[in-house]
Regions:
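Loop-to-transmembrane alpha-helix entry segments
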Residues: 58, 96-99, 115-135, 145-152, ...
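Transmembrane alpha-helices of multi-pass small-molecule transport proteins
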Residues: 25-77, 103-110, 160-168, 182-201, ...
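Specific transmembrane alpha-helical segments of multi-pass solute transporters/efflux pumps
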Residues: 12, 16-17, 45-99, 135, ...
Length: 332
């Protein structure tokens, strides 16, 4: 099951780059994002009101506000920077490379922020993953001409936004059903992108059929599949493992682009894909066992600190949502 979820996640997340390219020729980034999330948010709110009321019980305003912040970081901030970078002329390969740094950043911060143990095998896999992404995208990045240097900082900011959302979710103590999280995230993104589009005069959608085909692509594959599976795998396997799968996005996108758009796919891309696969295997095999570590904790009643044996799981283990409302196909 974990392997199938991982494969579905990689394909769904990679589809976002393909969908962005499909829509880039017909509308601006903010127009695409507004019409991607506005109808989706309406549908999700209606479904939640009719079928998913039980999933919302017990959640406080603070819980929902936290999810709104997570949605702002993981959807609005991340996607706007990716789409805007492509609009500025940064290639999809270079954007994927910068996004590929995310697992290394998240893995490095998992220890001090979440007190999670990252093994040497996992670090090896993380560095191999970076190498694989670099191999795939290096030629494309060096060949780019006419792109301002500051434009390459845009997807980097998006990567940091997604890292921040990942850690904010991992530190949440209240379990939020994926269906609820998806609704809040998409609703937040719809409000932000609509406000942005209206304020910049970019709200009117083009009449081209290709635009609406791209919107449908992004809603079904990238939104329901990509983000939903991201949070689902995060809760099942932890920060290090879920982010290591991000290393496969650039190679998979390169293969997909070769078949769909006729983009070149040579030996360098094939080598990078193999290295990325090896990295994922190393990390997933190296993190199977949890490590028991003694941490010092001061009792509330005072007195000297005491040593408490504490098993560090791969990720905080929230209670699973009610099975009747569990998101089976993914989310944004």
């Amino acid at each position: 099951m974990n392997a199938l979820l991982s494969i579905a996640f990689v394909l769904s997340w990679s589809s976002g780059f393909i969908g962005a390219k499909l829509g880039a020729g017909s509308a601006s980034a903010v127009t695409i994002l507004m019409w991607r999330f506005l109808p989706l948010a309406v549908i999700l709110v209606v479904v939640a009101a009719v079928l998913g009321r039980a999933s919302w019980r017990g959640l406080t305003g603070r819980d929902l506000a936290r999810q709104a912040v997570i949605g702002t970081l993981s959807q609005s901030g991340y996607l706007l920077t990716v789409y805007y970078a492509i609009q500025l002329g940064v290639s999809s390969g270079t954007t994927a490379l910068i996004d590929g740094v995310q697992p290394l950043v998240a893995g490095a911060l998992a220890g001090p922020l979440l007190r999670q143990y990252v093994s040497r095998r996992q670090w090896l896999g993380l560095f191999l993953g970076v190498s694989g992404v670099v191999i795939v995208t290096m030629a494309d990045a060096t060949a780019a001409t006419g792109v301002a240097a500051w434009a390459y900082l845009v997807p980097f900011l998006g990567m940091l936004s997604l890292v921040a959302a990942t850690f904010l979710e991992s530190r949440s103590r209240t379990p939020v059903p994926p269906s609820v999280a998806l609704t809040v995230h998409c609703g937040t993104s719809a409000v932000l992108f609509t406000a942005f589009a209206l304020s910049t005069g970019a709200a009117a959608p083009p009449a081209e059929a290709g635009f609406w085909a791209a919107i449908g692509w992004l809603v079904v594959l990238s939104t329901f599949g990509g983000y939903g599976l991201y949070w689902m795998i995060l809760r099942r396997s932890g920060v290090t493992k879920v982010n290591t799968l991000m290393f496969l996005m650039a190679p998979v996108t390169a293969v997909w682009g070769a078949f769909m758009f006729g983009e070149p796919f040579g030996a360098q891309t094939a080598i990078g894909l193999v290295v990325g696969l090896v990295a994922v295997v190393i990390v997933h095999r190296g993190g199977g066992a949890s490590r028991t570590r003694a941490i010092r904790r001061r009792p509330k009643t005072g007195g000297s600190p005491q040593q408490v044996a504490h098993t560090l799981p791969a990720c905080p283990a929230p209670k699973p949502p009610d099975s009747g409302h569990r998101l089976s196909g993914g989310c944004p």
